[in-house]
Amino acid sequence: MRLPILIINFKAYGEAAGKRAVELAKAAERAARELGVNIVVAPNHLELGLVSQSVDIPVYAQGADVEAGGAHTAHVSLENIKEAGGSGVILNHSEAPLKLNDLARLVAKAKSLGLDVVVCAPDPRTSLAAAALGPHAVAVEPPELIGTGRAVSRYKPEAIVETVGLVSRHFPEVSVITGAGIESGDDVAAALRLGTRGVLLASAAVKAKDPYAKIVELAKPLSELR
């Protein structure tokens, strides 16, 4: 995982469905190339293969099921993600929480497959527990701020500061990123100043009238950090 990082979660937004997912991913790729930063896209499972074939930037899955490949109807395995061209996976998002034992199994399996692993957590203490599982990064995301436009870096900066302190002290090999309510380049810059190595966001980019321009705005602080 190359840092600093900007991860754009497409969620299940209609603006990022079908061919629009490819268009958004290509806008992210263009911004990444022009700014020289690492931008990752996380399309819906249905579009993951199509997107991964259409761009050269990293493509992450939004989640995975603990079941391995085989007779598991309607499940998406880590093996499926890898085969479809995914290079990483986001786990335990507040909209798709996992039991601890399942999360531990998924982190270990994903790493064994060579996938980047980002584990989401709602607060500093849970972030520390997530870091103990050995992901490449933890993303602290207070759920009450997700989708509100009230950026964690401005409305709850103490969550970032405490998480960075705890994780860097006990698991320095695990990077800390953040998300929830990130809407602007200033929000991203504030998060980076607080010690994070990147941001995870969704609607700010996906729902923008001009996604390319918005992604450039959001990613520019990363280029200034390098």
From Swiss-Prot:
Keyword Nuclease belongs to the record: no
GO cellular component: cytosol
GO biological process: gluconeogenesis; glyceraldehyde-3-phosphate biosynthetic process; glycerol catabolic process; glycolytic process
SUPFAM superfamilies: Triosephosphate isomerase (TIM)
Entry's localization field: Cytoplasm
Principal subcellular localization: cytoplasm
EC number: 5.3.1.1
Keyword Cytoplasm: yes
Signal sequence segment: none
InterPro entries (alphabetical): Aldolase_TIM, TIM_sf, Triosephosphate_isomerase, Triosephosphate_isomerase_arc, Triosephosphate_isomerase_AS
Active site: 93 (electrophile), 141 (proton acceptor)
Alphabetized HAMAP family for the sequence: TIM_A (MF_00147_A)
Family (UniProt): Belongs to the triosephosphate isomerase family.
Quaternary structure annotation from Swiss-Prot or TrEMBL: Homotetramer; dimer of dimers.
Protein name (Swiss-Prot/TrEMBL): Triosephosphate isomerase
Gene name of the encoded protein: tpiA
